[in-house]
């Protein structure tokens, strides 16, 4: 018996690398040394940094992959993978430099997986980071044929004196919420249960734009790199940032606040997309689970002083983002109060 008979096609793996080369090369940056195919990727740090600090992040796409593979939405989950990583590291004010991907599959399907990598490359291009390397592992018997899992790794850099860590946030500062692109990549274990329980037709229209349900659910995660870089280039003094992922606003917004401060949120201050109301109704999801599972239309938060709100909102609008003042930072009104208050119970 040979390796191919055992389920691993080495020649197909080499052909797959050739298939994705163009997409990968399109993500290059001037700091890159050499090309793809070596044992490691090489990259210089950008010029002009006095005390560069590296910021690393890793993430996956979760069970959204199950739904995406059922409906052949391979390109979109590639973007999701990049977004879940870069959106985390930019909360420190860092600039993404490079991305690495890991794909594990039961049987190499070059057409499907090349679409995944094209999506990853697209996410990297929009984030101005190079897809410097990756690994595709064919694992017969471990994953079923036609199924794959993804993991991503991002490295970013920030000038040490410009690190944004929330330490300057004080009571009275304002919280700006930036629109999400739908569910992003969180809550899909619940979504899949709701779909199974409701028996909903995946092609039903769920909003005023007449978007089919499956398209609304599988919208790629928004990339906030350009937005944050634009705000920083306009010298908006951002005090803190939060990427709203699993756990929603209650779990993620307090992560950028100093100890001893709370966030007060006004739920009616932004438009919650209709897909979230559909899920809540179809799945009989309790109010607190709804808020603690989904982003509900807010994918990223900025904390700025009151006198910077107007300028920050103007920049968001100029580059095509809907954004709202959704709350404020305050001191706890009673001992032991939750870090985020104001949400419906």
Curated annotation (Swiss-Prot):
Pfam families assigned:
AIRS, AIRS_C
InterPro entries given for it? PurM-like_C_dom, PurM-like_C_sf, PurM-like_N, PurM-like_N_sf, PurM_cligase
Hey, which pathway is this one from?
A: Purine metabolism; IMP biosynthesis via de novo pathway; 5-amino-1-(5-phospho-D-ribosyl)imidazole from N(2)-formyl-N(1)-(5-phospho-D-ribosyl)glycinamide: step 2/2
The answer to keyword Nucleotide-binding applying to this record is yes
Subcellular location(s): the record lists: Cytoplasm
For this protein, the Enzyme Commission number is 6.3.3.1
Spell out the coiled coil positions from the record: none
- Key words of the record: ATP-binding, Cytoplasm, Ligase, Nucleotide-binding, Purine biosynthesis
A single GO CC term for this protein reads:
cytosol
UniProt cross-references to Gene3D superfamilies, sorted A to Z: PurM-like C-terminal domain, PurM-like, N-terminal domain
GO terms in the biological process aspect are: 'de novo' IMP biosynthetic process; adenine biosynthetic process
Record keyword Nucleotide-binding present: yes
One MF annotation (Gene Ontology) recorded for this entry: phosphoribosylformylglycinamidine cyclo-ligase activity
Q: Which transformation does this protein catalyse, written as a reaction? A: 2-formamido-N(1)-(5-O-phospho-beta-D-ribosyl)acetamidine + ATP = 5-amino-1-(5-phospho-beta-D-ribosyl)imidazole + ADP + phosphate + H(+)
What superkingdom does the record give? Bacteria
Q: Which family does it belong to?
A: Belongs to the AIR synthase family.
According to UniProt, the name of this protein is: Phosphoribosylformylglycinamidine cyclo-ligase
Protein species of origin: Prochlorococcus marinus (strain MIT 9211)
Gene name tied to this protein: purM
């Amino acid at each position: 018996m040979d390796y191919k008979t055992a389920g691993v096609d080495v020649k197909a793996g080499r052909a797959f690398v050739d298939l994705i080369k163009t997409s990968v090369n399109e993500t290059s940056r001037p700091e890159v040394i050499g090309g793809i195919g070596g044992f490691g990727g090489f990259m210089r740090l950008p010029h002009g940094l006095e005390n560069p600090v590296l910021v690393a992040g890793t993430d996956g796409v979760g069970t959204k992959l199950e739904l995406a593979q059922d409906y052949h939405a391979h390109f979109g989950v590639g973007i999701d993978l990049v977004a879940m990583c870069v959106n985390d590291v930019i909360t420190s004010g860092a600039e993404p430099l490079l991305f690495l991907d890991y794909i594990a599959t039961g049987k190499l399907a070059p057409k499907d997986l090349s679409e995944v990598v094209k999506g990853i490359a697209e996410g990297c291009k929009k984030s101005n980071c190079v897809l410097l390397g990756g690994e595709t592992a064919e694992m017969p018997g471990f994953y079923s044929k036609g199924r794959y899992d993804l993991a991503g790794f991002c490295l970013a850099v920030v000038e040490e004196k410009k690190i944004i860590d929330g330490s300057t946030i004080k009571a009275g500062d304002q919280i700006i919420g930036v629109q999400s692109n739908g569910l992003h990549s969180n809550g899909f274990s619940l979504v899949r249960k709701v779909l199974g329980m409701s028996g909903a037709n995946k092609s039903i229209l769920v909003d005023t734009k007449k978007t089919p349900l499956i398209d609304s659910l599988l919208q790629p995660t928004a990339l906030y790199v350009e937005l944050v870089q634009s705000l920083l280039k306009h010298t908006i003094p951002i005090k803190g940032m939060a990427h709203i992922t699993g756990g929603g606003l209650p779990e993620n917004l307090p992560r950028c606040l100093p100890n001893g401060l709370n966030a007060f949120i006004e739920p009616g201050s932004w438009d919650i997309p209709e897909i979230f109301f559909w899920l809540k109704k179809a799945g009989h999801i309790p109010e607190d689970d709804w808020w603690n599972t989904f982003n509900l239309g807010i994918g990223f938060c900025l904390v700025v002083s009151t006198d910077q709100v107007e300028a920050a909102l103007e920049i968001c609008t100029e580059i095509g983002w809907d954004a709202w003042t959704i709350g404020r930072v305050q001191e706890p009104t009673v001992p032991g109060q939750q870090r985020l208050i104001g949400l419906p119970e």
